[in-house]
């Protein structure tokens, strides 16, 4: 019953979301269209869908009904605001505004949130060593060395 979805941003606020028509799950991590599709299709973001090699054509067709507009006022660099408008085929509209979503500078992830995200790709002992290196050092080098050793950082 959804005709289209409009995602409203302040100017330039979607710079990290560089893919409007992602073809892989990895590209989908940087696509508001793919995230909105997941929320509408499944009720929440499905992390495993970011691992798929090819996004199905039917999903890409659906994402073409999701558009971006830049009609919100500019905000401070630490602020995040997004408005989503869903327009149904019968003309009804529903709008929701999100200020500072989880993971944004003013609403950071908790250590447990970070553990869960890392757990999607790393083993528990790797996560423990990374967090230990991060928490108990004032120097960047030991932390980066741990990331390299765990195969997370490749530079």
Which residue ranges define each predicted feature?
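Terminal-appendage/accessory-domain detector
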Residues: 1-155
